[in-house]
Amino acid sequence: MNHPDWQLLAEKAALYLYPRRCPFCGAVLGRDAVQGTVCPACFEAADKRLVHLPPRLPETEHAFYALNSAVAAYYYSGEVRHAILACKRGGELWRARELADRMAVLIWGAMPSQTPGRRPAALAPVGMPRYHYIVPVPPREPLPGTAGMPLLLARRLGILIQTPVLAPLYSTKPLQPQKELTRAERLANKKDAYACRPGTDLSGKRVLLVDDIITTGATVSACALALQQAGAYEITAAAVAATEELPKSLQKSTEKRK
């Protein structure tokens, strides 16, 4: 006998009290929402101009190690940058759910809902699961009393692709803010900066490592190394956005909007 999906039913009921909003501008989604999750204006501004195609990140732009692959839904620019900062620093935590829904559609090909605010339908993997666990990157400075953005993204993705979430990673040393550091300094700052809690056993597991932004790749790589040391044999890093130079075609379209 099929049991009802109580979480899905609760989401549908919550739509009447707390309407879903566009992850980029915050507007309440109407019947004209594109793919059920983005207002038409932001679809033109973000999804048509800032989507990272293909999602896989080139190693020439990053300094990856200990990872099998890395993917992102968007380039870190414009409306996407605004949405991430509003979530991380502005306390608008609801944006993490909406951005995770976009990740599911753009990275893993989930079927977008045709009804505004409804969750996208993940395509069930055939045979063995795509990932055994989803693991969030531990945030350096989460807002007081809140989960960090990577954990919020991981929880939503766990629902969408039906994969359990683990949070075994922790920082082993004080970390400097990465923003002002050079590429070499970022790598040194993150070297041996993470470990898995004692007793964590990921032997033979495929792990999806989730962060909000991938810049040099220093953070996700250092986390991946810790997961490897706990036994993980295949690790994919995924983020809402990646910091890379925009392709020339996107640079031109972005300049036209200014």
Regions found by a protein language model. Name each.
Residues 1-211, 215-258:
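Glycine-rich phosphate/pyrophosphate-handling loop used in enzymes and phosphotransfer proteins
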